[in-house]
Regions:
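Acidic (Asp/Glu)-rich catalytic clusters
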Residues: 35-39, 60-73, 112-115
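Charged helix-capping and loop-helix junction motifs
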Residues: 30-31, 134-140
């Protein structure tokens, strides 16, 4: 079953996107398509230095998020800018905890400068996938959220979901509109054909289905139950703005509203 916030009997679904990731060759912030994406979302996952982002990008993206009334989240990552945080790292848990704390704190400072606050944590890339099954790294991520009293985004059924419940952390289950799923409910690796869903009509159709009956068709055709609170489109997916517009239209057409939890 699909679960999300309800107000006066009307379901409210969050829509999120990864922002603050566009860097030029020397590594400085050059801006991206945030101005086009922010009006389409209710939560912004802001890169905070692990895989991308710097002080300027964090400050500017947070300022735009505040202007649009969009919730700010820390998109923490393995410390691996070279591979954009998409390579798994066998890093010791204490070192990972130190890195994630620094990333989170940097974003908190940037948000505060522009009158914003960080409301949640979302792991990025390889870390997101690792904490589905890796206990020690899942513990680091959940403890970060618990320590700062914020929510945590993640995959339904992951180790982070279980640990979040134990520590009293609000866990917001995420569904990806632009990513294909395997039959076990995990994301299809980006290296495999069909891992990305870039057709707006296809994104709209699968969004309509998951909101209406709580199911996703896996890459192999299997029908999988999908519980979620927030829907993601990656900003680096081709045509991200068009895909987000398709998600919004599909959600609203079901009678649900869009907004942060």
């Amino acid at each position: 079953m699909t679960h999300s916030t309800e107000t006066a009997g009307v379901r409210r679904i969050d829509v999120n996107c990864d922002l603050g990731e566009a860097l030029d060759a020397p590594g400085g912030w050059r801006g991206g398509h945030e101005p086009a994406l922010l009006p389409l979302i209710s939560s912004a996952n802001v890169a905070c230095g692990g895989h991308a982002g710097d002080a300027r990008s964090m400050r500017e993206v947070c300022a735009m998020a505040v202007q649009h009334g969009v919730r700010i989240g820390a998109q923490v990552s393995y410390p691996d800018r070279e591979h954009f945080g998409r390579r798994a790292l066998d890093i010791a848990a204490p070192l990972l905890a130190e890195s994630l704390e620094e990333q989170f704190s940097d974003l908190v400072a940037a948000a505060a400068e522009v009158g914003g606050r960080v409301a949640y944590v979302k792991p990025h890339g390889a870390l997101y996938n690792a904490v589905v099954t890796r206990d020690d790294h899942a513990a680091v991520v959940v403890e970060l959220a618990a320590r700062h009293g914020v929510s945590l985004f993640g995959l339904h059924g992951s180790r982070t979901a279980t640990r979040a419940t134990t520590l009293g952390v609000r866990f917001e289950r995420e569904w990806f509109a632009d990513r294909a799923y395997l039959a076990d409910g995990t994301l299809t690796p980006r290296s495999e054909p069909g891992a990305l869903v870039v057709d707006a009509a296809a994104v709209a159709a699968r969004t309509t289905r998951v909101v209406s009956d709580g199911h996703t068709v896996a890459l192999d055709g299997a029908l999988i139950g999908t519980a979620f609170d927030t829907i993601c489109v990656h900003s680096d997916t081709r045509g991200a703005a068009e895909l987000l517009a398709a998600v919004r239209a599909a959600v609203l057409a079901t009678g649900a509203t869009i907004g942060a939890a």
